[in-house]
Amino acid sequence: MNDDLLGKEYIANWTLNAKQHFDDGDYEWLCDIIQQCFPEESCKRILELGCGAGYSTLAFLLRDYSVISVDINDEAITHTDNLIKKHDYTSEIKTIDGPDFSQADALLWKKDLVEEWGMIYALTKQQESFKSIDLIVLCNPGGNISRELTLREKDLLTSGGFTCEEICNNIDNGCIDLLHKWAVIYAACALSKATGIPLLIVERETEGEVNRTLVQISNDVNMEIAKAFSRPIKNAPDGGTLLKNTMDTTDQLCWGAAVYLPVDSQ
């Protein structure tokens, strides 16, 4: 399956789940975390790494944040654009090689910003343009990914801490989504370190696994957890993004969130 078809499949599968999370108040909870951790006057512009179906973007806008969202999936960008415009917000879709902050409520960057999902790493080269960003948000990292895409981007995985042997073993064992998830997480942490901007990571797993994941991230990438939060998922969607294939699917799924601060910036 090519990347365009994967993008359409992702939006088709995720939109109903994302709408359910929105209706259940999960994204409101996420906004509450931001307001609890960051005073309103100190956090006005959010950089969202991956907009998905657009419901998290909409939730941010409803709380009066301005949002810059970057996604490699053109279908996700289009869906998000349509969704927020239905709620009377303005947005601009741009294909650019660096941040260009507009007066719109939301600025959506298309995947041509850089090649494939290595885009987050490439953003670290634009540090001077991030002075007006107050918070980076990475929500439920992952998404659909093909075997070919993982192999093509294995250099990013090795720079994120994986050995070539680990990459091959995980691909052979069908754990491609896990590799993709961690590569994106490492990239987001690298961006936070390079810019000195706090990073909010939100993960969806069982309660025990999400806690281990949040701690493991901080240890692996030398990031300090300032605050951590959790919230049970009321209506757990089928095929949720889980860290381990062997996980007992009868366990309660929950949202886990943590505010990460680069240790060097303390």
At which residue positions do the language-model features occur?
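Conserved alpha-helix/loop element of class I SAM-dependent methyltransferases that forms part
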Residues: 23-42
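Conserved class I S-adenosyl-L-methionine
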Residues: 43-52
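Conserved SAM-binding loop of SAM-dependent methyltransferases across substrates and taxa
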Residues: 53-64
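Conserved SAM/SAH-binding beta-strand->alpha-helix loop
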Residues: 73
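Conserved SAM-binding loop
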Residues: 80-81
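A short SAM/SAH-binding and catalytic strip from SAM-dependent methyltransferases
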Residues: 134-154, 167-178
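Conserved beta-strand signature within the Rossmann-like core of class I S-adenosyl-L-methionine
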Residues: 163-166, 196-204
